[in-house]
Amino acid sequence: MLKKLGIKGRVLLLTLLPTSLMALVLGGYFTWMQLSDLQTQLLQRGEMIAEQLASLVAPAMGNHNTQMLERIATQALEQQDVRAVSLLAPDRSLLAHAGPSMLNPPPAGNSSHMMQRSGSDATRYQLPVFGRHRNLAGDLIPDESDRLLGWVELELSHSGMLLRGYRSLFASLLLIAAGLAGTALLAVRMGRTINNPLTQIKQAVAQLKDGNLETRLPPLGSQELDELASGINRMASTLQNAQEELQHSIDQATEDVRQNLETIEIQNIELDLARKEALEASRIKSEFLANMSHEIRTPLNGILGFTHLLQKSELTPRQLDYLGTIEKSADSLLGIINEILDFSKIEAGKLVLDSIPFNLRDLLQDTLTILAPAAHAKQLELVSLVYRDTPLSLVGDPLRLKQILTNLVSNAIKFTREGTIVARAMLEEEHEDSVQLRISIQDTGIGLSNQDVRALFQAFSQADNSLSRQPGGTGLGLVISKRLIEQMGGEIGVDSTPGEGSEFWISLNLPKTRDDAEDLPGPPLLGRRVAVLENHELARQALQHQLEDCGLEVTPFNTLEALTNGITGVHQSEQAIDLAVLGITTNDMSPERLSQHIWDLEHLGCKVLVLCPTTEQTLFHLSVPNPHSQLQAKPACTRKLRRALSDLVTPRRARSEPEETLSSRAPRVLCVDDNPANLLLIQTLLEDMGAKVLAVDNGYAALNAIQTEPFDLVMMDVQMPGMDGRQSTEAIRQWESERHGTPLPIVALTAHAMANEKRALLQSGMDDYLTKPISERQLAQVVLKWTGLALRNQGPERASERPELGLELQVLDQDEGLRLAAGKADLAADMLAMLLASLDADREAIKAARAANDQNALIERVHRLHGATRYCGVPQLRAACQRSETLLKQEDAKAFAALDELDHAIGRLAAEARTNA
């Protein structure tokens, strides 16, 4: 508090505060003492008056002279402070009274001495009158000295005493106030003697601060202040001299700068030339990267193209598996090359991430499958552990995520000489619409020091440069991975101990999508028992989880002999084991020994599936009865494992018989889509696979068709003019409820659906949904799933759509259009022609909706165009539609820029079509 006061205020406070406290304490003490003395005097005077009255009234009481008593009582009122007097008989009956009624009640008790009772306004006295009191009047009667003659009561008022006390207090306060006033005057005078010189010093310092260094202070009237003023004057003189020297130095420096201007100008010219050379070098680098991109992607596209052609030919399951691995490897290589070439685009923040559904377990296992040969060549064990509480169906950019995992696993393989590499996926936190995941890659390699960890995520750097020539690499992989993870809103890090290994981890938040029905256990395997042999503990644990996810009851064994004995012991019992999965290497046993054990197990009715390293598959090829179906590479993929075990339990020939029974009639399918190209494609694909199709282009026609004809399934487009897909579904469900009929399966067809939109589709009454473009395999699966009727001529499983990477997407891709049309050139041409015919109208409709600021109409028109692009080879327009629709639905401010890019993409496609016409 004192810090906020000035010197004058402090002087006043320190002077007046102690004085005031002392004056108040002393004044209060003496006033209290005086009031106490006055009260004591009042009590003594009351006792004295009572004694005097007792002597005066004793003869009258003895003679019962009432008049005398009245006269004495009246005379007693003339005494100071006496308020009332009462004279009582021995029985306390009233003999005489003078004055008003007494305020206080009589004292309690019956004492022979004087009694009193005090109140706030008066004090009441009571004294007994005995015969001895007559002695004072000279009227003593023998033997009556102790006889009670009566009582004397009087009451003294406190008002006089209080008045005298108040007068004394008032006088004390006057004296205190006078003393404080004098003290205050002295304090003010003292404060001025201190404050005025300080004010002069303050003003002088302010002038010095403003640059008036000639300012000097006069003598201030006291030794201490004069010394302070002298010091300030010396400081001002020193500052003045320093300023003069500084000004001289500035003038000299200015002259030097003026002399060096020509040199600086020459340096600026040299810097400008160097900048131009750097820009030219950057341009040359960009051209080189573009040329390299073309030169590298061209053979890769050839590999992918011929892989697709081979997949359409008659191949064994093993060959199809090899082709699938080649295709996935080529896709990964193409993606990695494009990302490296696009490193500058990542740094500029212009990289656009995809947002599509994917299966986390499949992505992780596919990554390990691609890299398994490199790991097995070094005799490393690859293990994938996906914790059971981890959601598998997520939404994100699977190709970018796979690229990151490929980089991490590849690094782990490079820098691990022996041991195990474990890929884990676990749930950290789950919300209603999203999950927080942690994916880690742990190895038993060389480990990293703290210095290596700090430099790990820098461009063109490696943890151990001494090893760079052996494993290879540019040092860009982790930098690109870190940038991609950060753009996804996640985090990447590493925990490592030199000599013990490293664990790279990713923490990422991804939206959830609906559960994948294919992940549920299927009837062929549900409840069956399987024996497992795997010497590696983590690999055995992962394999056991995979088999349990397939619906199997797993019994692990430590040796092949123990497994054979265990199966023999339960043979021909209710606990018989139908299947055996053997994870082996040549270090565990020879192919000849394995062949003998498989022969023994086959005779016990137990089908065997062998898992071995990719580098040893040729060695074990002749050890199994059917290597195409009973031999797989480590680490096992859950989907391949389920398919292989299902084939062992129920061979395809046996399973085809009930399918032929089911498919004895063709399924009747109603297709609803307002886009003629989409409607034509779905109708053609279904009819080519043997379905009976009725195609309509609006919801009203669909409702009318359902009310007049029986159907097994409805393929319903979501966004249509008039009655859209949701409204049509609700109308169909209402009509079914009125007729108490069996609900007809309705599958939504949509070009773009986020997680919340997919939930809304299912809540509106639809049973399932498919995302465009739709392949023959997807159509066959959904028809079989909801009708139980199989379609024929299902092509091999291929990715329906592959996100394009690179610096620029193609405007028109004829090969992609042919692939999306299931290899039908006429259909692909018709689809493209129908898209181009409606392109101008769609462009104008989008512009009109944008000008009218009609958000719903804008989303509807973009979605309609997006659906049409899903079946044509127009990658650039499709990507622009998808980005625009996503940003519009998210109400993102970048949506307008995306719409501008969409308009440019439409123009480029129209120009390209005219050029190729």
From Swiss-Prot:
Catalytic activity entry: ATP + protein L-histidine = ADP + protein N-phospho-L-histidine
Coiled-coil blocks: none
Annotated TM spans: 11-31, 168-188
Cysteine disulfide partners in this protein: none
SMART domains in alphabetical order: HAMP (SM00304), HATPase_c (SM00387), HisKA (SM00388), HPT (SM00073), REC (SM00448)
UniProt modification remark: Activation requires a sequential transfer of a phosphate group from a His in the primary transmitter domain, to an Asp in the receiver domain and to a His in the secondary transmitter domain.
Subcellular location: Cell inner membrane
Recorded GO CC terms: plasma membrane
Modified residues (Phosphohistidine): H294, H863
Protein keywords: ATP-binding, Cell inner membrane, Cell membrane, Kinase, Membrane, Nucleotide-binding, Phosphoprotein, Transferase, Transmembrane, Transmembrane helix, Two-component regulatory system
HPt domain sequence ranges: 824-917
Function: Member of the two-component regulatory system GacA/GacS which controls the expression of secondary metabolites and extracellular products. Activates GacA by phosphorylation. GacA acts (probably primarily) by activating expression of CsrA1 and CsrA2 antagonist small RNAs (sRNA) RsmX, RsmY and RsmZ which bind to and prevent translation repression by CsrA1 and CsrA2. Involved in the regulation of secondary metabolism and in the synthesis of the antifungal factors cyanide, 2,4-diacetylphloroglucinol and pyoluteorin.
PANTHER family linked to this entry: HYBRID SIGNAL TRANSDUCTION HISTIDINE KINASE J
Protein name: Sensor histidine kinase GacS
Encoding gene per record: gacS
